[in-house]
């Protein structure tokens, strides 16, 4: 058992002791990026997603680029799409072109996968240069940028802290844990590392928790942790949870 595993277990026990009113169900719902990343999603499923998002005023919708025409236009709900997803191995020009297309379709947020294989293979500068180019284009189009680490591939929480500090220096808007497409999704220790980087940098960067967040109790744990570490109430401007089924589970608790 690793140190991170021990940390996850003890932190979950500690977070369980916080009263439920510390973070409300409504706060959690308004922090959700309601996600449907199924290449074969039907028109009916996308219409239901849009309806659920608008009825419950989630933070954003997150879907594949090819499904945007069926969702747009949106009104009060932000719309995100994924780029360089899920393996983080697209050529940079392909990602840049996709962002240009998304901007034309009216997207307001980009969830971009860090070229983590490059980064972890020692080509850190090349990976960060690609992120810098993405960040500059997003800034040009006034798009919020969430960079997905795929935190389950990193060897330690110190490594997650280091990459988070580097991405904060590139002025990304959120650091996101996982694509949700590998076995290891988000963990409490990963979130501690990212939140520590945000706090130490005194940055306006936010955090997005994603990868296996299905139960209200999980969402509550991460929200409480974020509030304790950043010392302010959660809201969609700096705290998000990416999930497909969490909204339905939270609504059952009302």
Residue ranges and their predicted role:
Residues 81, 85, 105-118, 169-187, ...:
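Glycine-rich phosphate-binding active-site loops on the catalytic face of alpha/beta enzymes
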Residues 26-43, 80-96, 117-123, 146-159, ...:
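Active-site mouth loops of central-metabolism enzymes
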Residues 65-87, 124-146, 169-170, 186-214:
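Alpha-helix-loop-beta-strand connector modules within alpha/beta enzyme cores
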Residues 90-104, 155-166, 189-192, 199, ...:
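Catalytic cores of alpha/beta
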Residues 27-36, 59-63, 78-84, 110-112, ...:
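Hydrophobic faces of well-ordered beta-strands that scaffold small-molecule active sites
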Residues 99, 109-172:
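Conserved anion-binding
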Residues 1-40, 44, 192-205, 214-254:
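Alpha/beta catalytic cores of nucleotide-metabolism and tRNA/nucleoside-modifying enzymes
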Residues 58-109:
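Active-site cofactor/substrate anionic-group-binding motifs, chiefly glycine-
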